[in-house]
Every structure is written in C-alpha cells, then in structure tokens.
Amino acid sequence: MTEAQRHQILLDMLAQLGFVTVENVIERLGISPATARRDINKLDESGKLKKVRNGAEAITQQRPRWTPMNLHQAQNHDEKVRIAKAASQLVNPGESVVINCGSTAFLLGREMCGKPVQIITNYLPLANYLIDQEHDSVIIMGGQYNKSQSITLSPQGSENSLYAGHWMFTSGKGLTADGLYKTDMLTAMAEQKMLSVVGKLVALVDSSKIGERAGMLFSRADQIAMLITGKNANPQVLQQLEAQGVSILRV
C-alpha cells in the first residue's frame, strides 16, 4: 500500500468517525506505530486533519458566513433575490418599512434603496449600506450592539414601540402552520415588541425552511399577512397557512 493510499483511507476513517486513535490507524492499515504517527503528522501539516494527543480529529469545514461583501454565498441566494424583489413591489411611495436582520433583509433593503420610502432598521450592515448610497430616509433603531447578529437591541419596554411602519419584513429559521420560528431569542423578543404597531407583517422565508421548526415561535400564523417564498415550498404547509388567512406569493 502506498503512502497516498494510506492517507486516503485515514481521511475516510475520519470522515466517518470524526476521531481516530493511533491504535485505530495501526490496526486498520496494518502499519507500525512510527508509520501511523508519521502519516498523521504529514496530514496535519497539510491541513487535512488536526493532530491531537494519541490520535487525530477531522477538520470541520464551516460554511463561510455571508456579509454584504460576499452576499452571493448566502444559502439559496437566487431564491432570496426573487423574494426580495417581490417584497419591494408591495411598498408604495411615501410608506415606511421595518426591515430586520439577515441576508434576505439586506437584499430587500438594496431593492428599496433610492425609492421614496422610509426604511427603519436595527441591522447595521443594511443601515451602513443605505447611508453610503445616500438613501433619503433611514431610521436606525438604537440600543446595545449585538456582535453576533450585527444589530442593535433595546432594553425591554424601550422606545421601540415608536417605530411603527406600514410594513414589517422579517425572516426566520422555520415556518409551519403554527407560525414563524426564530433561533435567536434576543432578536426575536426585540422584534416581537413591534408586531402590535406595524401595519402588515410579511414573512420572507425561502422554500427550504417551510415546514421546519427551529427555535422559538416568533409569531402565530394568524399574525402574518403575507408569506413570500420559493416555488419549491411544501404545498401542504402553504395550504394550511392559506386556511388561516395568510396570503401566499411563490416566486
């Protein structure tokens, strides 16, 4: 067996198990302890595994986190672009919109930029973009900066209730007949305070999340005026939502 063949088998073991000991490698490949350690060292140096005490660990490849600079890497990017374009068509000149955080939110803000609408947001990447593009009317909701979500969050019972928009556009990690789910509790609670003062709540949810439950229930289905999603969304869930008065737009 060649060195390259040994390395491939070792990597296959890690892909399946996540961790192997030197003894595992010796037994599987029928090689000496010195050869097993040498193989692990070489693969560690080449960045293909992580050497640990008495063995090796697989290296988890994380999906790059999207930013406005690499927006094309956002999951289901093309569908989200269609969703954002459709959402922007709902808003009339002179109206105000609340746009929250996330890749779809940024895409929607980009579609709205330059139009005669007031944009209310706590999402700093979007706010910075709108200011840089000299959008006429931008309101940035104040509060403490949350690094993980790049947003500002206000204390409970703060002045967020003053920011009433004709429309509120938001996304989530899942949507079922029960309603819209979000995984970040602080973000969800901050947005929930605005539900009673906005005109219409529109959920922007790509088709992969329809039928999924993830995190906390942010809003009941009967609180959602409209859902904009992709054409591959679960039809059974869409029927259940329509039965509760939710308008469905598939793009």
Swiss-Prot record:
It holds the Pfam family DeoRC. One of its GO terms (molecular function) is ligand-modulated transcription factor activity. One of its GO terms (biological process) is regulation of DNA-templated transcription. HAMAP family: HTH_type_UlaR (MF_01563). This is HTH-type transcriptional regulator UlaR. The gene is ulaR. It is found in: Cytoplasm. Residues 20-39 bind DNA. SMART domains: DeoRC, HTH_DEOR. One of its GO terms (cellular component) is cytoplasm. Gene3D superfamilies: Winged helix-like DNA-binding domain superfamily/Winged helix DNA-binding domain (1.10.10.10). Keywords: Cytoplasm, DNA-binding, Repressor, Transcription, Transcription regulation. InterPro entries: Carb_Metab_HTH_regulators, DeoR-like_C, DeoR_HTH, NagB/RpiA_transferase-like, Tscrpt_reg_HTH_DeoR_CS, Tscrpt_reg_HTH_UlaR, WH-like_DNA-bd_sf, WH_DNA-bd_sf. The lineage of its organism: Bacteria, Pseudomonadati, Pseudomonadota, Gammaproteobacteria, Enterobacterales. Residues 3-58 form the HTH deoR-type domain. Represses ulaG and the ulaABCDEF operon.
